[in-house]
Amino acid sequence: MMTILIADDEPAIVDLVRFTLEDPHVQIVDAADGAAAVEVARRERPDVALLDVQMPRLNGLDVCRQLRRLPECAHTRIVMLTAAAQAADRRRGLEAGADHYLTKPFSPLALLTLVRALVPEASVWPAR
């Protein structure tokens, strides 16, 4: 089973991402702030972490840096999923250790395709 962490303080975004990626082969966990995201990641060891940049308590860039230092998250693929769309924002996300950077608003199909490409286990999902 694949585990995906959604870290975003906007419930509507969490719901959209959950709906997009929901599958019997996928466990989805979420966190509404950056500090909680680090704790959930430490406990759940997600295969993919989708991080908003602008979150309370700890921003997504700092969450990304912390996850990269955790041995239990060494395998985690990190996607910054954020409204910060400038080239400098993208550069900061990738420099923080993200594997990919997807801006809001995003296409649900683009998100699903990206997650499938990032994680080989995603191939167990049937085509929609």
What are the residue ranges of the model-derived segments?
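Active-site residues of response regulator receiver
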Residues: 8, 52, 82
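Receiver (REC) domain active-site loop signature in two-component systems and cognate sites
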Residues: 55
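C-terminal output helix
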Residues: 106-115
